């Protein structure tokens, strides 16, 4: 077991100081946390600097913090912001590491078994390992996660107990170290040296930790004693410095020792026999044969390799858990006294609630037809009440908190005043009759000023028809539908900001997480059609898209004013009055937010100049030139990966592989 350093403190670095409502919000949140309050809500209007307030709170209470967002894009944005605020602390990123994921499933109607198929993003896997190792080594850690953090991850105790701890002067033979590395799922590869692998050259062992991407460690032996440990550049072997202590964390999160493995295997065998007997009694001979064949193969792999594909389905036995007991998750890697912050909580808490049921219905089918043992049902996400049991202290962050959050606490801390002095937009209702011509006129007014427009519709058909109509009228417009991938979506936002087009139309894509200061008009069609997209919270979120421009204006097209519309307009007007009073008192003139476009697209740079320049004929380069080219590209790849631009990083990697192949 390793000792966690608990003396580190968070150090917030920012050229800004709290302003507007921020000082009061920060003070209240910190006082409540230090006073032991379990739950509170930060109700912050769009553009009031909620992330900065969160950072100030984290720095002042000085607790390890888990920040949960409801999708990878928002998690990536938050990760980048927290990295800037806390450059000297451990800011980690923990999301699903699948680029592509087809879960294992069975469709009885067509007798179709769909095998699990996935593509793992190596960079995100590295970041996940970095998160868990940081949590066990230090206390000044912020982990920004998606709801993947409530999925099973393996026992933190087994993970920590499996750490290989090395120091200069330690008595351990080279071969014993190699055995220890294999036990924690490292692979020996003397040629292709990358994460999770080690290589051996005489009395020198080089290890590439699973949580690193360009630095490895060289362990030099003198007999059966470690002579010294050095940190090196994995590519060039250049020595970066001496190391007094090296903790090598397992290459997988699903760890168990030999004794526990044998216990687990005996339990798996017993469960298999019970399931076979049950199937045979029910006359399900095919299912009985199937579960025996599949399980015996997995047991053989576990005995020989300590691992098998789908090992997570046996995690209940390997962790020593009882039936129905919740799995270990990222939350178990945190110390007991940690802080949780839920970003856009009105969305995120709904996701946390829904994960369990969807997972269980799919797995029950696999169990009923002999593809998995019943214990596979315990490889699952947490139920919401199980998530709640992990909560020591929590802050829900949203402009529109949901009913669930409001039931958890009466402590609501408002943040309405923007540091920029910007007001919530004016909102007006216009009749739907003649809305197309009216909207066209409003768009043209904005376009003449170099401003942009968001339009939100209720149906795909309406969005497509409106897009076609505006194009015919000479408007530069795009429709962003739900099939568009995250990377493309961010590029569309970038093009809107650059003025490649002036109008963006969407359905449920113009609410949380899209902040474009150039947008001065938001048009809401069918505003009086009550429902998920036109309830009070949905309308307030959509109105907020115009709150980053000093000319922000919202038009609701409707034939009547619904209760949701009225409440959304009343709340917006209330905030606007408070903001105007504050500005008048302090002599503030609202200014449109000046936001560099590269900040919005940091995780997806799409400029052609950012692509690696591919040399047409690498064979014409000398070996020394090729090595220099590889080193330069490695640096570019590293920078792209740190910005979470995995598409660009993969392109650079392909160029590097092509260069290496020449040798």
From Swiss-Prot:
Positions occupied by motif Beta-hairpin: 97-120
Cell location: Cytoplasm
Keyword tRNA-binding annotated: no
Name used for this protein in its record: UvrABC system protein B
Domain (Helicase C-terminal) ranges: 435-601
HAMAP family to which the protein is assigned, alphabetical: UvrB (MF_00204)
Function comment: The UvrABC repair system catalyzes the recognition and processing of DNA lesions. A damage recognition complex composed of 2 UvrA and 2 UvrB subunits scans DNA for abnormalities. Upon binding of the UvrA(2)B(2) complex to a putative damaged site, the DNA wraps around one UvrB monomer. DNA wrap is dependent on ATP binding by UvrB and probably causes local melting of the DNA helix, facilitating insertion of UvrB beta-hairpin between the DNA strands. Then UvrB probes one DNA strand for the presence of a lesion.
Nucleotide-binding listed as a keyword: yes
Primary location recorded for the protein, binned into one broad class: cytoplasm
Domain-related comment: The beta-hairpin motif is involved in DNA binding.
Residues of the UVR domain: 627-662
Keyword list, A-Z: ATP-binding, Cytoplasm, DNA damage, DNA excision, DNA repair, Excision nuclease, Nucleotide-binding, SOS response
Native organism: Streptococcus agalactiae serotype V (strain ATCC BAA-611 / 2603 V/R)
Stretches assigned to the Helicase ATP-binding domain: 31-418
Subunit and interaction comment: Forms a heterotetramer with UvrA during the search for lesions. Interacts with UvrC in an incision complex.
GO cellular component: cytoplasm; excinuclease repair complex
Gene Ontology MF, one: excinuclease ABC activity
Binding site for ATP: 44-51
Superkingdom of origin organism: Bacteria
Source lineage: Bacteria, Bacillati, Bacillota, Bacilli, Lactobacillales
Protein family: Belongs to the UvrB family.
GO BP terms: nucleotide-excision repair; SOS response
Gene3D superfamilies: P-loop containing nucleotide triphosphate hydrolases (3.40.50.300), UVR domain (4.10.860.10)
InterPro entries recorded: Helicase/UvrB_N, Helicase_ATP-bd, Helicase_C-like, P-loop_NTPase, UVR_dom, UVR_dom_sf, UvrB, UvrB_inter
């Amino acid at each position: 077991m390793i000792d966690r350093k608990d003396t580190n403190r968070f150090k917030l670095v920012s050229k800004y100081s709290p302003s507007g409502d921020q000082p009061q919000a920060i003070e209240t949140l910190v006082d409540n946390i230090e006073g032991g309050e379990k739950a509170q809500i930060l109700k912050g209007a769009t553009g009031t600097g909620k992330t900065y307030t969160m950072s100030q709170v984290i720095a002042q209470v000085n607790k390890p913090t888990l920040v949960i967002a409801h999708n990878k894009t928002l998690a990536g944005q938050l990760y980048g912001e927290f990295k800037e605020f806390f450059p000297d602390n451990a800011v980690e990123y923990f999301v699903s590491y699948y680029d592509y994921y087809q879960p294992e499933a069975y469709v009885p109607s067509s007798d179709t078994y769909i095998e699990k198929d996935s593509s793992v993003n190596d960079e995100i896997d590295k970041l996940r390992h970095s998160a868990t190792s940081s949590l066990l080594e230090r206390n000044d850690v912020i982990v920004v996660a998606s709801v993947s953090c409530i999925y099973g991850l393996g026992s933190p105790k087994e993970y920590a107990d499996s750490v290989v701890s090395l120091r200069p002067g330690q008595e351990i033979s080279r071969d014993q170290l190699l055995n220890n590395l294999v036990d924690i799922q490292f692979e020996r590869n003397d040629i292709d040296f990358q994460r999770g692998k080690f290589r051996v050259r005489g009395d020198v062992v080089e290890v590439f930790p699973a949580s690193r991407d360009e630095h490895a460690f060289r362990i030099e032996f003198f007999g059966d004693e470690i002579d010294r440990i050095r940190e090196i550049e994995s590519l060039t072997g250049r020595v970066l410095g001496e190391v007094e202590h090296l903790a090598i964390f397992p290459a997988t999160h699903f760890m168990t020792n030999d004794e526990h493995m044998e216990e687990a295997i005996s339990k798996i065998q017993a469960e298999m026999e019970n399931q076979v007997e049950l199937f045979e009694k029910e006359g399900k001979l095919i299912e009985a044969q199937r579960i025996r064949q599949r399980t015996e193969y997995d047991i053989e792999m576990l005995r020989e390799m300590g691992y098998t594909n789908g090992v997570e389905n046996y995690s209940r036995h390997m962790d020593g858990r009882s039936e129905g007991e919740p799995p270990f998750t990222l939350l178990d890697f945190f110390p007991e006294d940690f802080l949780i912050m839920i970003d856009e909580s009105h969305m995120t808490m709904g996701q946390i609630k829904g994960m369990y049921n969807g997972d269980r219905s799919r797995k029950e089918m696999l169990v009923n037809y002999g593809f998995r043992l019943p214990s596979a049902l315990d490889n699952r996400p947490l139920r919401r009440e199980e998530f709640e049991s992990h909560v020591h202290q929590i802050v829900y962050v949203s402009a529109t908190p949901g009913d669930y959050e409001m039931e958890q606490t009466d402590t609501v801390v408002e943040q309405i005043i923007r540091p920029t002095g910007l007001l919530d937009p004016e909102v007006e209702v216009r009749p739907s009759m003649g809305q197309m011509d009216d909207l066209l006129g409003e768009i043209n007014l904005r376009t003449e000023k170099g401003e942009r427009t968001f339009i939100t519709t209720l149906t795909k058909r309406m969005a497509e028809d409106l897009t076609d109509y505006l194009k015919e009228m000479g408007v530069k417009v795009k429709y962003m539908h739900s099939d568009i991938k995250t990377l493309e979506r961010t590029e569309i936002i970038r093009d809107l900001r650059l003025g490649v087009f002036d109008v963006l139309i969407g359905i449920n894509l113009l609410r949380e997480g899209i902040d474009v200061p150039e947008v001065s008009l938001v048009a809401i069609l069918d505003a009086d059609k009550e429902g998920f997209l036109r309830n009070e919270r949905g309308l307030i979120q959509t109105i907020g898209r115009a709150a980053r421009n000093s000319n922000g204006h919202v038009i609701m097209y409707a034939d009547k004013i619904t209760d949701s519309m009225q409440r959304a307009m009343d709340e917006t007007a209330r905030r606007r009055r408070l903001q105007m009073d504050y500005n008048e008192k302090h002599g503030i003139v609202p200014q449109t937010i000046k936001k560099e476009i590269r900040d919005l697209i940091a995780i997806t740079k799409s400029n052609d100049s950012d692509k690696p320049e591919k040399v047409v004929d690498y064979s014409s380069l000398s070996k020394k030139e090729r090595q220099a080219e590889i080193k330069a590209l490695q640096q570019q790849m590293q920078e792209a990966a740190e910005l979470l631009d995995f598409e660009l990083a993969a392109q650079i990697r392909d160029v590097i592989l092509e260069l290496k192949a020449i040798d």
